Amino acid sequence: MGGNMSRVVKAPTGNKMVCKGWLQEAAYRMIQNNLDPVIAEHPENLVVYGGIGKAARNWESFDKILEALKELENDETLLVQSGKPIGILKTHEDAPRVLLANSNLVPKWATWEHFNELDKKGLMMYGQMTAGSWIYIGTQGIIQGTYESFVEAGRQHFGGNLTGRVILTAGLGGMGGAQPLAGVFAGACVLAVEIDPTRIQKRLETKYVDEVATDLDDALARIKKYTAAGEAKSIALQGNMATVIHQLIEKNFTPDLLTDQTSAHDPLVGYIPEGYTVETAKTFREQDQKAYLKAAYDSMAKHVRGMLAMKDRGAVTFDYGNNLRARAQEAGVENAFDYPGFVPAFIRPLFCKGSGPFRWVALSGDPNDIKVTDDAMRKLFPHKKDLLRWLDMAEERIAFQGLPARICWLEYGERAKAGLMFNQLVAEGKVKAPIVIGRDHLDCGSVASPNRETEAMKDGSDAVSDWALLNALVNTACGATWVSLHHGGGVGMGYSQHAGQVIVADGTEKAARRLERVLTADPAMGVFRHLDAGYELAHDIAKERGVRSLWL
């Protein structure tokens, strides 16, 4: 990858700008925040998370992006193509300051093979979801969605209570690292298997995992002790899940909940085959890509066979959106899709309400600014008990990574309310600098991903990606600060298209108008999408909240 080992990137903080406006300054700080070593998985290679999800195509492009943002006027827009800055256009003050298109390929050519060829030539970059769109906030970014999934699983299968229950999972990377803490927040014990010891160490340091077991017997003894006491604890175990899951079956261990967040979306760089360490896998990959891919696919097949066996033994089993089932099916596991994805199982009712991951970042770098926003959120939504519980636990347990940030799931109507309130806090000087508001591309109306967010849609429209494109167009029209349109995030090349928006609350009247437009229209796309697919809940929400569908 030609990494730059000596270079350490961190976002500037404070209320002094180096750019010509706070909107440009926000993008300038957030791309650098994505590469802060406490956030990024491999910052020396510009890799933020998710296998090879990058913030910029190469170091030259990264430097040019920073230079361009410093020069950018308040009525200009920077264009970025797969992590490479292309040019600056005169637009207008309410237009986005940056428009990004990452990893997009014509469908017939949308394969890892073709992408890898282009990547080798320096013509492409994998943007994942929030890596190439500059709004990754570390593992907290996914944690509330994971928490919501576990809590909903508890509601559906365990009478609303996960106390004394065990969640078994694998993968402690940028996304998967949220699982142990989310499980503990939901009241369960978590056993998380991870092949890379540096990732385990990182999660331990940031308090996302409580303990590390020395071996499988030690892990099981700890789990037994904590579940008997009704204590919620998370334990990491170094190992390969393709091996460990079968050892657990031999030991007659069946968890209550079973899922996986290894980097199966990228079989070449993300998933480590059975029998290899991170180092030996790297050598193997460099020596023989074809043989490596076969080994990875064989391991994924074995991994999924173990999951299916545990499902048959009573474990509530679901896919966590990394495309593991599809890989296993390609490797010969015909019934790999016998267990559902997490969205149809637990998240879709939230999507019907225009609910999704609303995140905000304090550009000042001062953690107290997030404390101020947390308190303001409590006053704004006193009736949302799960949200209040989440804010309390997040304050207590979540270590900030890079610029201080918070995430929570908010519905249609609530997002605009929160955005305007943040803008007011900036205007009144209650926070020390503007606030950046964004979200994951995993949202109610911004993604087409038939093996994840749009799996098993009621009307069979799983693969229709017009909605993601419309979402990007709508957010551009409404004046988001930067808008991104990506391909392949979460599940890999050929399997998804998705859009993101980021908007800055700088305390001005103009910002208030933009915030109201963007934070209303963005979740409205989710209500439209699900209403169109025939979901009654989306129909009811549209009627109740005045969403102007032409099909009510």
From Swiss-Prot:
Pfam hit, one: Urocanase
Localization in the cell: Cytoplasm
One CC-aspect GO term: cytoplasm
Residues binding NAD(+): 50-51, 128, 174-176, 194, 199, 261-265, 271-272, 320, 490
Co-factor note (free text): Binds 1 NAD(+) per subunit.
Reactions catalysed, as given in the entry: 4-imidazolone-5-propanoate = trans-urocanate + H2O
Matches recorded under SUPFAM superfamilies: Urocanase
Superkingdom to which the source organism belongs: Bacteria
Gene3D superfamilies recorded: Urocanase like domains (3.40.50.10730), Urocanase superfamily (3.40.1770.10)
EC numbers, comma separated: 4.2.1.49
Primary location class: cytoplasm
Function: Catalyzes the conversion of urocanate to 4-imidazolone-5-propionate.
NCBIfam families found in the cross-reference section: hutU, PRK05414.1
Family, similarity comment: Belongs to the urocanase family.
PANTHER family noted in UniProt: UROCANATE HYDRATASE
Protein name as annotated: Urocanate hydratase
